């Protein structure tokens, strides 16, 4: 059905499963491997003989040549994109007698969750793993439901230098990587999408371990003018609808021709689409910035000119570029913020695996800095702060 008004709030409510997920996390913390084996049998209907996936090399060797080629090509593209935006190891300067700067250091141990669902998703492992490799992460661990670990997952894991693959899915996988078990290594950060149980688990463990964010259902906003190809618009919307019935799909257009054609063609579909007539492209940009979508597609004649006006979006495709290419081979990531989070953060990149360490050095700072520091420290009641500064430079 076609809707002509946007909802006030997008559905992404995992609060209804929080209590169940809390119990899972608590059980894993208490029982470790024993809990994982029991929970896998309960939820994934698999009786594990080993939590650590064996014979990765053997499984990787079974990959088909065409799939291997596709993975190699996409791996290289993602690597080159992230390497091109990787910052220098040290950035700094000086002022008023003080040398200062930042050092970029990689996170040491990362856990990547590769979701199950109807299919295995090797593209997610590429998107999460390659930026970690570029950043210099020394230990990468992967967890995925046991029935979804296939030759593609194994092959990519070898290319990434993954230390171990765990045959664990769902909230129990997140708990295991967050707190560690007899077999599963405790990591510093967990990255990767998943269902509401996985997202609830990431939310609950986020006070103890880093996470990439809370990813909700797929979102796409298309802004189209009269130059856009309506058939391509329909394909782009249907492509993102493949992610499930919870997807949030919006067309904003100032063209009656586009609006009418797309509405007619999509009306027979079971998914819900929002088709909105706007007065101008500027108005459409304003609406898109308020939505802050995961994917934004500017299918307009002057897309490059309008790109700087985009303030909030996970990823933007310009002109005739299909949004789906970012899901696979463009180089930027498909693990993107949803549900308005694009207002404050972006998609996964090399920066998600780097941390800043600030430094300062001085033997002779200008007197005004010394005096200012002492005055403010004493004002705040920190006398020894003031003395530790003053004794060195007076």
From Swiss-Prot:
Give one GO biological process term: L-histidine biosynthetic process
Enzyme class at the top of the EC tree: oxidoreductase
Origin, by domain of life?
Archaea
Q: Name one GO molecular function term.
A: NAD binding
> Which EC number(s) are documented for this chain?
1.1.1.23
Q: Where does Zn(2+) bind?
A: 240, 243, 327, 385
Question: What is this enzyme's catalytic activity, as reactions?
Answer: L-histidinol + 2 NAD(+) + H2O = L-histidine + 2 NADH + 3 H(+)
Name of the featured protein: Histidinol dehydrogenase
Which species does the entry assign this protein to? Sulfurisphaera tokodaii (strain DSM 16993 / JCM 10545 / NBRC 100140 / 7) (Sulfolobus tokodaii)
């Amino acid at each position: 059905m076609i809707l002509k008004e946007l909802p006030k709030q997008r559905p992404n409510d995992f609060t209804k499963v929080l209590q169940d997920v809390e119990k899972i996390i608590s059980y894993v913390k208490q029982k470790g491997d024993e809990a994982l084996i029991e929970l896998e049998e309960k939820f994934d209907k698999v009786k594990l003989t080993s939590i650590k996936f064996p014979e990765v090399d053997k499984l990787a060797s079974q990959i088909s040549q065409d799939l291997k080629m596709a993975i190699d090509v996409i791996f290289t593209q993602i690597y080159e994109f992230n390497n091109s935006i990787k910052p220098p190891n040290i950035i700094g300067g000086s002022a008023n007698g003080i040398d200062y700067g930042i050092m970029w250091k990689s996170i040491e141990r990362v856990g990547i969750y590769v979701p199950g669902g109807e299919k295995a998703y090797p593209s997610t492992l590429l998107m999460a793993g390659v930026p970690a490799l570029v950043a210099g992460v020394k230990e990468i661990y992967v967890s995925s439901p046991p029935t979804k670990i296939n030759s593609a997952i194994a092959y990519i894991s070898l290319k990434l230098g993954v230390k171990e693959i765990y045959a664990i899915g769902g909230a129990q996988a997140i708990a295991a990587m967050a707190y560690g078990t007899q077999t599963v290594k405790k990591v510093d950060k967990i990255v990767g999408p998943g269902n509401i149980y996985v997202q609830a688990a990431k939310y609950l463990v986020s006070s103890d371990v880093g996470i990439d964010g809370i990813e909700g259902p797929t979102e796409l906003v298309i802004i189209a003018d009269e130059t856009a190809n309506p058939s391509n618009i329909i394909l782009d919307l249907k492509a993102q609808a493949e992610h499930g019935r919870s997807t949030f799909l919006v067309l904003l257009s100032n063209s009656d021709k586009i609006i009418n054609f797309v509405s007619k063609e999509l009306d027979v579909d079971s998914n819900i689409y929002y088709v909105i007539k706007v007065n101008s492209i500027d108005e459409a940009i304003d609406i898109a910035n308020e939505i802050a979508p995961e994917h934004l597609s500017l299918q307009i004649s002057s897309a490059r000119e309008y790109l700087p006006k985009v303030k909030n979006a996970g990823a933007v495709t310009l002109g005739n570029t299909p949004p789906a290419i970012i899901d696979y081979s463009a180089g930027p990531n498909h693990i993107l913020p949803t549900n308005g989070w694009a207002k404050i953060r972006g998609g996964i990149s090399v920066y998600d695996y780097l941390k800043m360490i600030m430094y300062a050095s001085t033997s002779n700072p200008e007197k005004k800095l010394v005096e200012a520091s002492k005055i403010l420290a004493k004002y705040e009641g920190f006398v020894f702060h003031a003395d530790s500064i003053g004794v060195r430079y007076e």
